[in-house]
């Protein structure tokens, strides 16, 4: 048994982060690796990453990291497990082919996907934008009526340009 990663984290924080990013994963299963979440532990930061190749999301959480490393497992299954746990602290560790979720009363195992197949999300350096969320929400409400809900072919606006 060779442990690749081992951490302890607050269930509440982990569940909240998973809830936010799990919606971006590929639920249709067209590309199976995109239904996974990349779990990375480094320097007391636990990072969760998902993508559907159009949009990617990363969430960073404080955690007690016993061994730095990574895990890669199905985000929906992981979220369902975490959501139903009663313990306030969770231990997560990964081995060659499995990701383990452990509490004092239970232990779950999820199949681990191949890290090399998961797409890398590259963020531009020094590209941080900070704003109050209500300002973005108000702006989106104004332009939403102009965005088509269906791709009708030809020239149809199905997105919003941010500048």
Predicted regions, residues:
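Structural preference for solvent-exposed beta-strand-turn elements
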Residues: 1-163
């Amino acid at each position: 048994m060779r442990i690749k990663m081992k951490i302890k984290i607050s269930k509440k924080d982990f569940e909240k982060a998973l809830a936010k990013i799990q919606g971006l994963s590929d639920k249709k299963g067209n590309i199976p690796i995109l239904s996974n979440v990349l779990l990375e532990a480094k320097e007391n930061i636990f990072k969760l990453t998902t993508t559907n190749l159009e949009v990617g999301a990363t969430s960073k959480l404080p955690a007690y990291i016993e061994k730095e490393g990574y895990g890669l497992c199905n985000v929906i299954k992981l979220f369902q497990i975490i959501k139903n746990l009663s313990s306030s602290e969770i231990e997560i560790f990964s081995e060659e082919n499995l990701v383990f979720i452990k509490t004092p009363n239970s232990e779950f195992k999820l199949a681990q996907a191949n890290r090399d197949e998961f797409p890398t999300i590259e963020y531009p350096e020094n590209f941080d934008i900070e704003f109050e969320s209500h300002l973005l929400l108000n702006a989106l409400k104004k332009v939403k009526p102009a965005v088509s809900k269906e791709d009708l072919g030809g020239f149809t606006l199905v997105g919003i340009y941010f500048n």
